[in-house]
Amino acid sequence: IKVKYSSLNFKDALSASGNKGVTRNYPHTPGIDAAGIIEKTSGSKFKPGDEVIVTGYDMGMNTSGGFGEYINVPQEWIVKKPDNLTLSESMAFGTAGLTAGLCLRKLLTHGLKPDDGDVFVSGVTGGVGIISLMLFKKLGFSVSAITGKLDQEEFLKSLGANQVIDRNTLDLDLISPLQKPIYSGGIDAVGGKILSNLICST
C-alpha cells in the first residue's frame, strides 16, 4: 500500500520513546493508522488502485507502520475506504475516531437517547474525547466535558460541551458506591478514580 496519510496517536509516541510493551524490535517505523492506495496484492479481496484504510492490529507496533512511504500488511487488516470520506478525512478520524464511534455505537445499541439526560466525556481534550463530544452533540445529547485543562473551556464549548467540569473534583477516593444519578451514560478516556466516581453517578 502506498501510504498517503497517517495520524499521530499516543501509542506512536510510546513506540518512538522505546516502550517495550508497544514495540519490541528497533529500528522501527511507527504509525498505527494509514490510508493509501493498493499498488500490489497477493490476495483476492482488493485490487491495485483501491483506496483503503488500515488501523490497529500490529501495525506500527511490531510491523512497520503508517509513517513509512509504503506498508505491507495482511489483507485481513485492510478495509475499503468509505466513499463519503477522502483519504485525508479518514485519517482525521483514525484510531481515535474509530474508538469513539465504537463506544457511541455500543451506547446507542443499548438504547441511550438524548431524552435520557446528560452524558459525560472524560479526557475530553484528547483525540477520543474530542470526537466523542462532537458525535454526542451531533446526535442531540447534552454533554458534560470533564478535563484537567480548564483553560480549554471556551474551545470545548465551541465544540458543543454544555458544561466543563474540573476532573480534580472527581479524582478522589470513591465518595460513595451509590451517588446521586447525574448522567445517563458517557465515554471515559481516563479510568481510575475518575471513572469509579462517574460510574457511581450514572
Positions of predicted regions on the chain:
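Glycine-rich cofactor phosphate-binding loops and adjacent beta1-alpha1 units
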Residues: L112-K113, S144, L159, Q163-T202
